[in-house]
């Protein structure tokens, strides 16, 4: 098993050298506090250290809903709200003593899904001559990795709420909503798109659900979005969206291609959801 792991580590090292990834920027006060701009199509490098905990801090309005890694047996992942704690751990090799974390062999990929975004990481167990502050600085090991998000749309919306940059008459408001049993608490009060983005508007103080685009085969994919005042602005237009929060579920259907559809946002109960 460990021989196979060593072979996999060699392949992983080749992959790391063959593909580009985003290297976080060290902090001016301390290089172990690192920042990286968020981009949905970039892989971010995370350097950890045996015996130390690294935390990844996402947007304060995000909540982690899924974590997966290629070599999950060699790492401990502890999500708490919008923070993910990471620590290397011994590999429980069958029929032989447990293998302690070893730089190179423990390198893997890490995938994180929140209720707002998808994140991709190369997770590397760094090495140095000694576990001293100077060695940790040289290794660029991260105590904290935090993301910087583009244009802070929440702050901009507080100053002057923005909407679609098209005339109101050009908006598609032909959307229908199917509400599952007991799911009224996550129901939007309006839905529309401008051909590029979709807006779902909620009542003040209403919690935002996770939003998924539904493919023709029924597969659901978490969408990228940002918050504009009381609206979720989805960075795409989809035929069907699913809103989920715990057991609550709502189906939003884009009826723009249906000439018989009402031009106003409609809602009807659908207990089968």
Curated annotation (Swiss-Prot):
Residues 1-20 form the signal peptide. Its main location: membrane. One of its GO terms (cellular component) is cell outer membrane. It holds the Pfam family CagX. It is found in: Cell outer membrane. The keyword Repeat does not apply. Keywords: Cell outer membrane, Membrane, Signal. B.parapertussis strain 10978 harboring a functional ptx-ptl promoter from B.pertussis produces the PtlF protein in a stable form. Is also able, but less efficiently, to produce and secrete the pertussis toxin (PTX). Belongs to the TrbG/VirB9 family. NCBIfam families: VirB9. This is Type IV secretion system protein PtlF homolog. It comes from Bordetella parapertussis (strain 12822 / ATCC BAA-587 / NCTC 13253). The gene is ptlF.
């Amino acid at each position: 098993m460990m021989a196979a792991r060593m072979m996999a580590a060699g392949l992983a090292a080749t992959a790391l050298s063959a593909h580009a990834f985003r290297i976080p920027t060290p902090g001016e006060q301390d290089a172990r506090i690192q920042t990286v701009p968020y981009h949905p199509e970039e892989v971010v490098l995370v350097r950890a250290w045996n015996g130390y905990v690294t935390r990844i801090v996402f947007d304060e309005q995000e909540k982690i809903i899924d974590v997966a890694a290629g070599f999950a047996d060699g790492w401990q992942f502890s999500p708490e709200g919008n923070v993910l704690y990471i620590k290397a751990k011994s590999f429980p090799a069958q029929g032989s003593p447990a293998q302690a974390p070893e730089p190179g062999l423990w390198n893997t990929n890490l995938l994180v899904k929140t209720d707002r975004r998808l994140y991709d990481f190369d997770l590397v167990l760094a090495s140095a001559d000694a576990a001293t502050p100077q060695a940790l600085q040289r290794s660029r090991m991260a105590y904290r990795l935090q993301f910087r998000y583009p244009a802070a749309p929440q702050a901009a919306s507080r100053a002057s709420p923005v909407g679609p940059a098209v005339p109101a008459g050009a908006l598609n408001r032909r959307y229908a909503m199917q509400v599952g049993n007991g799911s009224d608490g996550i129901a939007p009060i309006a839905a529309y798109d401008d051909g590029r983005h979709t807006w779902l508007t909620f009542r003040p103080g209403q919690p935002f659900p996770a939003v998924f685009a539904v493919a023709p085969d029924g597969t659901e994919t978490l969408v990228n979005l940002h918050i504009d005042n009381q609206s979720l602005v989805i960075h795409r237009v989809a035929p069907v969206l699913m809103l989920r929060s715990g057991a609550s579920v709502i189906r939003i259907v884009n009826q723009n291609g249906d000439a018989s559809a009402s031009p106003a946002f409609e809602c009807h109960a659908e207990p089968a959801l």
